[in-house]
Amino acid sequence: MAADEVAGGARKATKSKLFEFLVHGVRPGMPSGARMPHQGAPMGPPGSPYMGSPAVRPGLAPAGMEPARKRAAPPPGQSQAQGQGQPVPTAPARSRSAKRRKMADKILPQRIRELVPESQAYMDLLAFERKLDQTIMRKRVDIQEALKRPMKQKRKLRLYISNTFNPAKPDAEDSDGSIASWELRVEGKLLDDPSKQKRKFSSFFKSLVIELDKDLYGPDNHLVEWHRTPTTQETDGFQVKRPGDLSVRCTLLLMLDYQPPQFKLDPRLARLLGLHTQSRSAIVQALWQYVKTNRLQDSHDKEYINGDKYFQQIFDCPRLKFSEIPQRLTALLLPPDPIVINHVISVDPSDQKKTACYDIDVEVEEPLKGQMSSFLLSTANQQEISALDSKIHETIESINQLKIQRDFMLSFSRDPKGYVQDLLRSQSRDLKVMTDVAGNPEEERRAEFYHQPWSQEAVSRYFYCKIQQRRQELEQSLVVRNT
């Protein structure tokens, strides 16, 4: 579809430009061989050994976790969140969080944008992609809403009613040739039909009745009827063959197959609303418009309608609920009138006018409806767009890692001693967290640590707790001995 290709092509072009900018540094509008100049100190290679943090300090053996602090591993098939008693996110929640994470991962940090001014071109492309996605999503919602409503257009269906006469042949051997007969054909086609798939003629009708002259063919053989059933096979036309050598007057009654069904309004309601034949929803909407125009809705209770004299004559009540209108409309809606065509089946060989044409209005599906449905169901470019998204995320992640390495190298080059000290302090804090060690072993091993004012109070508290603990043990032992 054209709209699908345009939308998919626009998204692919945006993704390609984003990826080309990130990988090669090519700005939109720059020659393919041009590259962005990099500023600042050179970045270190990926996976630099300076980036790793040792698990423990040099000279210390790996400390094991206290047995009381150890937690049993969750059973197989159970996530860490389940082991901790937290609810496991459902698949839609994981999908939404992954989408939010991916959108955040696409944005370059401000520090990188300051280092590389040309990265603003990438941010502009990212903003354009976001606007494009919003426009496509808004259009998809509009199309979904439009598909919920009937989409019909008026077209002209041309009917061809023709007949042929076969005179009797005295020397014919079979019985069919020895008797004169005529054949009536009813066919038709849409005028100016742009669709490639031609619609069958019978698909426009719910029923077809051909009424012949009762005086010629009797009361039991003068009607030819066709009615649609769930198993009906569509056809391009109808044929009726009867014996006879006299001109016959016939009446064709054609009932159109309305989708959605339409009804003929009661004459009083038709005059009130200005409608003759319409669908039920259109009739209810027109009735509500009449109520609003004439201010018939109750000012205190909006659920009720106070009828005027015409309203009361039609619905036979002065006041009713609006929810009762669909039920009361049932008695006021009649089957639509059939199309009536009078035709003369001529058997006169000199009569050249044996084909009659009639144009009738029919409703057909909007051609755009199929294209709109195809647009909603199309996934032709989703895989390519997802692949480009993955490449962009990987490239952004690589850029962030290189930025961390650059900051490490730049800080180390400016103040090697201070940076190493800061790194050791940071790793020392990490070591405490990993080994669950409380306090500061480096300070605790020095005597000055215990000459601070808090030490006297700590000693008093310690001995007090020990005395209380010993007293409780003695009291328990005396109680046991006395019993």
Swiss-Prot record:
Compartments where located: Nucleus
Protein known as: SWI/SNF-related matrix-associated actin-dependent regulator of chromatin subfamily D member 3
UniProt modified residues of type Phosphoserine: 178
Tissue: Ubiquitously expressed.
Similarity comment: family membership: Belongs to the SMARCD family.
Record's function text: Involved in transcriptional activation and repression of select genes by chromatin remodeling (alteration of DNA-nucleosome topology). Component of SWI/SNF chromatin remodeling complexes that carry out key enzymatic activities, changing chromatin structure by altering DNA-histone contacts within a nucleosome in an ATP-dependent manner. Stimulates nuclear receptor mediated transcription. Belongs to the neural progenitors-specific chromatin remodeling complex (npBAF complex) and the neuron-specific chromatin remodeling complex (nBAF complex).
Domain SWIB/MDM2 positions: 258-335
InterPro entries assigned: SMARCD3_SWIB_dom (IPR038043), SWIB_domain (IPR019835), SWIB_MDM2_dom_sf (IPR036885), SWIB_MDM2_domain (IPR003121)
Stretches for region Disordered: 27-102
Compositional bias segments (type: Low complexity): 78-88
Organism: Mus musculus (Mouse)
Entry keywords, A to Z: Acetylation, Chromatin regulator, Neurogenesis, Nucleus, Phosphoprotein, Transcription, Transcription regulation
